[in-house]
């Protein structure tokens, strides 16, 4: 997850400025049965009042103080105590915040924890202070996953602090923990049903079915518990996937609508005479009618179909000005318009009303093992210490031969470890440009970061490597880029170019992307600036460098 996790300097731990995260430990080899978990800790909506929870306190319908941090054990979870649950009469450890924002007699003029030092002292003064508790159930696998988590936060400086976890075994025949876990899942499923977030009828039906089955349970046994929790978890997972997909589609169609109705650089005005523009416009109207009219989609497949149709229409619009008929082997046509967002940036309007380039991953699909992938402020794509695949289908590509060119590199570990491996001719090549189309599969390894070592820096973040790593070099300094900002400047200079040819058969849709198949500690890849060239079809236009 995200957020700043710290346990230094005091005997308590915290996660600050996070939105969706878990901190947990898994204990194995435990006997089956119920367990009681206690922990001292609290949830603060925002240590800096970013979401105005001070102003919302005590107000009817207040959502700013809804607790979004939880103590959990396996399937059971319990909202954490609010930071206001244990007000102090004095400024403990000179690390508290005085309550001046409410007339509530239980809080006004008192002090609340505002850091780890005050939390530690208050926890240690009395073991009942900020004491959270829940019961849970350990099944026949003997595993207990215990911890704290946060989800659903959309503002800054949300804060959870915690310490002193204790676990008590309640016995094999005690089903209290199982009932608590089942109740928690039913509560979560009901909350998802009641949510006003856009979703599908398919997901709601699944949640209702799981809730009804769990609510009809009589005597709870280990077997019944396992069956019901599996059904509820599956329904909740699918419900969340449906909500996420519906929200993503709504965001996508809203962004298209804004640019379709706008004018100037940040709009689609220059494509208004293309067939794709009209198709995209009509489709946005259709989707908005669905959202505003029915207020719900039928199935997840319907959402995915709408998303693909949007992508196809958008790609058709972007490539609407390309004259593919003039292409031949000697004079290929620039077909970069077939790639949605080839340079990971989009035109947008800033707070001053200025049109600027903003980092964007629109158009690209990502499959990531650890979540260490994304577009950075420098408007390049970065994969750090992760295995990922970043790709997109190239809709509307006519049959024929193509060449794709991009800039990108791979560093096999931290810069020193990678440098040693390079010197010893042992550096791995775990990142590659790829195109898949029909039965064809074209791959080109990304250049090593050491294929462009310079005596001068591109950016202040570039690092100097020891001369011993370059025994055959006469250069005075050996700099390589070490941050996306430096990578972007190197790419602008033409460094780290990588390319491959590929062929598209009639009616086929090629998939273009970059993937990192292996993962080394601190290994790193950056890439950007995709360009696409079309050579036409037929043997006469087969490029000399093409390989089947």
Regions found by a protein language model. Give the residues of each.
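Short beta-strand-plus-loop segments that form exposed binding edges in beta-rich domains
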Residues: 148-158, 489, 513-524
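Extended, low-complexity, turn-rich repeat/linker tracts enriched in Gly/Pro/Ser/Thr and Asp/Glu
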Residues: 16-18, 31, 42-64, 154-158, ...
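Extracellular beta-rich ligand/substrate-recognition surface
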Residues: 8-22, 121-126, 376-389, 487-493, ...
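Extra-cytoplasmic beta-strand recognition segments
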Residues: 21-52, 132-140, 146, 165, ...
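Exposed low-complexity, polar/acidic, P/S/T/G-rich flexible segments that act as propeptides
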Residues: 157-176, 520-541
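Beta-rich interaction/scaffold domains
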Residues: 173-333, 541-548
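Extracellular carbohydrate recognition and processing domains
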Residues: 75-141, 155, 440-507
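Extracellular glycan-recognition surfaces and repeat-rich motifs
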Residues: 1-11, 340-384
